[in-house]
Amino acid sequence: DAAALSAFEVVIKSPGISAYASPKVDAELHGVRFTSGTAIWFAENAGAHTVCVTGTKGKSTVTALVAFLLRAAGERTALAGNIGLPLLELLDVQPPPDAWAIELSSYQTCDAQRPAVAVVLNLFPEHLDWHGSEARYFADKLKLVTDAQPGIALLNGADARLREVGNALAARGQRVQWFNTDDGWHVRDRWIMRGGRAVIDVKFLPLPGRHNWVNLCAAMAAVEALGIDPVPLAQPFLRRPHLPQ
């Protein structure tokens, strides 16, 4: 409880403990400072090459796909955060990975710092008991792009709320890129498209359902945002030998 926590100067908080309720709020009144495994990792790995992914739905799939594609590109890539190993267990990995694919929940997004690419997939009300309100949940989720100072904010252009946020970010100088738009990576007529170019027939994908095809679009866009052509990297993922020309 708050009284017990007041015996400590700094407490490493589990993500599942709400930032907006007791015991954290009450302990802070007694001068206790809180941090998290996520915050510690980013502070200790300020130069890490990270792709951070959040969203109400699909973030585990997209993070895993990003790691798959980067590994196919020859990048030693760690899968971490809300998927794979907890960040606190990866403070001093030797040799360090070339890249990190990190899944972040709404409990963790406020602690990320300067990812190379920050991906927000979608927003639906969730975890309201932790956040206290729908508005606060959305705001906390969006801290990955509004507060974390990403190199590139990659957003779902088909989500009206994310479109509004992205336009506001771009107006203040943030680099913003989009997926799920006609000029980017998107799904059309059972094809994965890059703008007007048909790239992958979805019948060759082991991922069922349109939502997963959009997830693949997000991952392809994230890798592309790093300056890597994702098309040849998807080759081992398909159930046939060659991508269409």
Regions found by a protein language model. Name each.
Residues L5, H131-A135, N167, Q174-Q245:
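Adenine nucleotide phosphate-binding catalytic loops in nucleotide-utilizing enzymes
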Residues A3-S6, P15-R175:
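Phosphate-binding loop of NTP-binding sites
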